């Protein structure tokens, strides 16, 4: 319900913007701040009423303050690194190509955010369990949850992304009257980046659970900051805007490898098992489920009816491939059990 209230309030903000004669950007920022404060207060009230362990009291624990400050400092470093390369890319694109290309990137990021929201909600349910199992020293269960979260998140994101990757042009033509140049390529590359990046989220949660994030944040943040100088170098040598996204893709892959190496030593994670259960299955699902939709996209004339056909084929192809290739044997049995229970319930 709180999420619904959040969305309704933001919709109300859009309506109020059409009524005001004041500077709309400042007014929008002010209203957005009020909404965030109200939502935060609402969450606080809810937790206080429903969880007995949620209570405020004044304490003085010097060691606890030191630990929290240390954790917050290095967490802030990682967040600043992410903001720096994200906004830095915007500045570079504006410097070399002007606002039109920045507009294309903004559209691509908007598509990315809409699709990623589905996986973010799913991962939000598993993250506390990952942290809890580290706290009780059940590393085996923690590893299982990390593998499952990375795998399922990839499948869910790919399920939503495949039709968008294939039918980017027609989706944009239905959405926008004028599509900025480079938007199609930007969306396709940024969705590939998202599919690699989504597998890192449970690893980030695992690193945070240990509390020992100094080396992790410096190393991974440092790798991601390299996006800026390399992108600048590419553009300075006459590269096209897409090169910035390809540089981003490369360093996201490097960061993932570095991240796995660091997590391995932090929680004794098996890289072989991660590669076998997550990477290999994700790769096989991607390759096998793309065949029929891709052939249809290449062979059929691009019309609105073809668009709907490819969407249906993508959904069916990914669903079937995930079931037979992506899931582990015990997971397939669980799915079949749930389906049988649902059928029996409907019959009764």
Task: Please name every model-derived segment.
Residues 264-275, 293-348:
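Membrane-proximal transmembrane or re-entrant/amphipathic helices at the cytosolic face
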Residues 15-16, 41-42, 143-198, 225-236, ...:
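Alpha-helical transmembrane segments of multi-pass membrane transport and lipid-handling proteins
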Residues 31, 38, 73-74, 89-91, ...:
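Alpha-helical transmembrane segments of polytopic membrane transporters and translocases
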Residues 1-2, 26, 47, 191-223, ...:
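Membrane-interface junctions at transmembrane-helix termini in multi-pass inner-membrane proteins
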Residues 2-49, 71, 221-226, 240-262, ...:
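Hydrophobic alpha-helical transmembrane segments
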Residues 25-32, 43-86, 125, 129, ...:
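Interhelical loop/hinge segments that connect adjacent transmembrane helices in multipass membrane
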Residues 51-53, 108, 112-150, 157, ...:
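Helix-loop junctions and terminal segments of transmembrane helices
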């Amino acid at each position: 319900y709180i999420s619904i209230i959040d969305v309704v309030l933001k919709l109300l903000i859009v309506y109020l913007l059409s009524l005001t004669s004041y500077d709309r950007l400042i007014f929008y920022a002010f209203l957005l701040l009020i909404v965030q404060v109200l939502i935060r207060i609402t969450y606080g009230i809810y937790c206080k009423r429903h969880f007995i362990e949620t209570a405020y009291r004044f304490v003085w624990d010097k060691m606890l303050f030191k630990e929290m400050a240390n954790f917050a400092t290095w967490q802030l470093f990682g967040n600043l690194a992410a903001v720096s390369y994200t906004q830095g890319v915007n500045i570079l694109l504006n410097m070399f190509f002007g606002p039109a290309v920045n507009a294309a990137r903004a559209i691509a990021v908007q598509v990315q955010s809409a699709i990623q929201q589905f996986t973010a909600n799913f991962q939000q349910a598993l993250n506390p369990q990952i942290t809890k199992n580290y706290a009780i020293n059940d590393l085996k269960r923690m590893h299982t949850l990390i593998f499952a979260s990375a795998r399922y998140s990839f499948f869910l994101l790919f399920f939503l992304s495949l039709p968008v990757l294939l039918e980017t042009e027609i989706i944009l033509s239905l959405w926008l009257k004028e599509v900025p140049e480079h938007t199609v390529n930007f969306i396709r590359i940024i969705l590939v980046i998202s599919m690699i990046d989504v597998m890192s989220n449970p690893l980030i949660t695992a690193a945070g659970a240990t509390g020992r994030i100094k080396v992790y944040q410096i190393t991974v943040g440092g790798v991601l900051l390299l996006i800026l100088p390399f992108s600048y170098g590419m553009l300075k040598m006459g590269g096209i805007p897409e090169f910035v996204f390809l540089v981003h893709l490369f360093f996201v892959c490097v960061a993932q490898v570095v991240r796995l190496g660091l997590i391995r030593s932090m929680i004794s994670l098996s890289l072989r098992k991660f590669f076998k259960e997550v990477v290999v299955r994700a790769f096989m699902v991607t390759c096998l489920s793309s065949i029929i939709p891709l052939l249809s996209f290449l062979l059929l004339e691009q019309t609105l009816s073809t668009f709907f056909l490819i969407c249906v084929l993508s959904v069916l192809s990914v669903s079937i491939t995930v079931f037979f290739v992506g899931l582990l044997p015990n997971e397939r049995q669980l799915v079949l059990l749930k389906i049988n229970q649902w059928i029996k319930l409907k019959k009764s």
